[in-house]
Amino acid sequence: TPDAQWVFYVLLDGAWRPYAVMRHRVGTPVTDDVEVYREADERFWVGIGLSFDERNIVIGTGSKTTTEVLMLPVDTPEGSFRAFIPRETDVEYDVSFACFEGAGEHGEDIPLAVVYHNALNPNFEIDVIDMRTHEPPYRLGEGVRVAVGSPYGCEHGDDVEPGVSSMPIGTPYSNPCNPAI
């Protein structure tokens, strides 16, 4: 943690797969460490880190086709991790946390989450969630969609936009919800 009072670390199983997260209070015996998360599904690996804005401790779990992010506010390191967005089979997502300090209408902070996911489009989309609206868990597709990948050339592209799979190679593709760059 940024205050140097707590250390979170992963445990490895016999196959060197990170599968559990432990919490250690600096200055106490390792025997007092507490398991805060265990991944039972052997297809998933586990990682732990601090969010970019240093406001959350983040556990990331992932298999080849499915991911999940759990979070815990850094000011409550003895609390319980919560899924940011609950795990959904064959859906990948990642979250970056940011905070515009003092940028609210009355000087309050504006915590945001930038979510990159493939729930609605095989080539992913990016949503921004204003975390002032409610506590997690959030749902995939919540927030403001700011960019969408092209479904062109994807195995399931026609599920997103009918006819896109039959477009000739080299055909320009533009999605009106993407910003002009």
Model regions and ranges:
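Secondary-structure transition/capping motifs at alpha-helix termini
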Residues: 1, 28, 75-78, 102-108, ...
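A flexible loop/linker signature enriched in serine peptidases of the S9 family
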Residues: 2-3, 10-20, 39-43, 61-68, ...
